[in-house]
Amino acid sequence: MRVLIAGGGIGGLTTAIALRHHGIDVLVLEQAPVLNEIGAGIQIAANAAIVLREFGLEAAMHAVGVKPQSYDYRDLRSGRMLYQAPLGDEAAARYGAPMYNIHRADLVQLLSNAVPAEAKRLGTRCVAVSQDKDGVEVTLQTAEKVRGDVLVGCDGIHSIVRNHLRGEEEKHFANILMWRSLIPAERLEGLNLEERGNYWFGPGRTLITYWVRPKKLYSILASVPAHEVQRESWDDSGDISEMLRSFDDAEPRARKMLEQCSSVFITGMFYRDPIDDWTSGRITLLGDAAHPMVPFLAAGAGQSIEDAWTLARVLSRRQDDIPGALLEYQQRRLPRTTRIQAGARAAVKLMHESEPPRVRDRNGRWKGMARIDPLAETSWGLAWAYNVVKAVEGPPGEVLNTTGLREGKRLQRVEGQRAFDLWKYAFRPEDVSRGHDGLRAAYDRFLTTNFPLLEGVSAAEDELGDVKAWCVSAPGTLRGNVVLHFHGGGYMIGSAKGSLEYASRLAAAVDGTCYTVDYRLAPEHPYPAAIDDAVMAYRALLSRGIRASSILVSGESSGGGLALALVLALRTAGDPLPAAILAVAPFADLTLSGPTVKAFNGDDPAANRDLLTFMGASYFQGHEPTDPLVSPLFGDLAGLPPLFVTATQGEVLLSDTTRLAERAQKAGVDVTLRLVEDSVHVYTIFPFLPETKTTMEEVAAWARRKLRRNETRPQAAE
């Protein structure tokens, strides 16, 4: 087999090395006459270092590069530490290899040295490609035609090979320009720049800086809004004074560091949207040709290197079925690269927030993450905690997709799989890339599209005190019982309007009315905003003459945790307690210490450790996550009203439910626990599931026993 590789950058050279490592003949076709790179640093994380180790190149990389001890996040103006991600030996033990910072030219050189001269043709530009049943053909600018069995497009974001497969496609500008520079060590004396990722974050701008040659050469990447740079070309040397103006208010150490730049060049931050197909017959794409991404998460080169190993491995196993091998390569890689593309864009958005309230919210989230994720696995693990050498030996379906779900995970029943798929496709890559804004919009779309309010149901906007809510009554309800319901969404997404259909079934279950509450959401409104709103809403019901003995407090996921926290707060304040609590898969432990958070991570289409960390930290921020009003699992549960709690076997938050039920029972609470099989997180919001019908019937019977009829039928506020 002979594989033609279009492009001799990091992806192309690594592909050549990987294929030769597996005994496959290669020819790299590179248009540049010399393999060199513009002076810049590059980060090679554990996921990529593991592959280079297989080639015997890690020692060479270690000899010329730097192993940073941490990523230190600082405020650009004050220099105050915001967050620290430990690296060094600690990260090497955690991820299987260290992180390396290296000069891009040094990396290209060591890769090029591993590819013999006869396997490279430089100064050779590809202008056309074609294929037939027997092989592929590349036409060069000289009109020479080169034949092979496989063509791999490693020719970057402007790929000729991609254009052949897919036609011209739009690439997107992130409206960010990056100033890059390399500074000799002698110009940085006295600045105490340790062998760490020294990062500064300001409104709409960042400084990503680190050593690329030990105590010899320092790399700076300064990102700024595009409108702050006035020039016709973004590809050559820039005006240093223009860069410095963008960092006028930087703290002294950062400012002095920038002043040591003797030359800078500018690049734009571009990307393409994820695609669902990059292979056709004997031709495939790799690296930026397939999945160009913004340069964050230390992921761009790493994904190319992972691609290269996967491609080589599957081709070596399926040499008699080249098209099938290339499709398997795509199947194994596409879910992961799509996830990294979306995650990198989300990181860019997060780190370039420009409005002061959003900067405050982001920094608050980092405070929270430092409490429950001190090793920064949520921030970096999605890219780094992956061993492609091991993964390619397992089933393709084990790879995690955009939402952190194992791509091949399936349920046994048709109805269960229907609910599973609704969760699986609720959040698109574009939604994820927009951070909590995108997740919020997507979750409301998911709920309102799939669970519309049925005809005949009365739903009206209301206010409980100062808290917005919806009042829902199902047809034919007669009693004056009331459900006070709190929607789920990790305290960060979700809305009362999105839960109207479920609220109508809750109202029917108690033969009364359901108020679903629009409590304030994080990160804009961290703790105690949600609990304050919950208390106000409950007291507003009492002020309308509704008896506590006729109120059922309800919630799913974070809403279930909030319902429990509400009752704890009411007990402490001496308020009358509601008659009962319904908690569906409650998010009751925001420290994420439950064993199923780890055990079922990747099996749950609705929740995973990274998402729960992001959401939980957004809510409690600088507050203690073990506070029972944040994590009611840690509260004194004695004296709570009767509790009906339910969850699905195999879901991430299962252990929150089971531990809560166990602790409540030990405290003397009247507990009803129902666990269902082969289902999904907060299964009760899916009205078509048989287990939903069964559970809601049980809840109705249970509620009849626990609630006392209210003498005054509740009315919406005028």
Q: Language-model segments: which ranges?
A:
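Conserved N-terminal helical subregion
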Residues: 1-3, 20, 45-184, 227-241, ...
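N-terminal cap/lid segment of alpha/beta-hydrolase-fold proteins
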Residues: 435-476
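Alpha/beta-hydrolase superfamily serine-hydrolase fold, recognizing
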Residues: 461-718
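Conserved mid-domain beta->alpha element of the FAD-binding
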Residues: 8-33, 152-153, 179, 209, ...
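Active-site substrate-recognition segment that forms the wall
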Residues: 195-229, 244-247, 269
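Short beta-strand immediately N-terminal to the catalytic nucleophile in serine-hydrolase-like folds
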Residues: 6, 153, 286, 553-555, ...
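N-terminal targeting or regulatory segments adjacent to alpha/beta-hydrolase or S9 domains
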Residues: 399-449, 712-718
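C-terminal helical "tail/cap" subdomain of flavin- and related membrane-associated enzymes
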Residues: 63, 313-409, 428
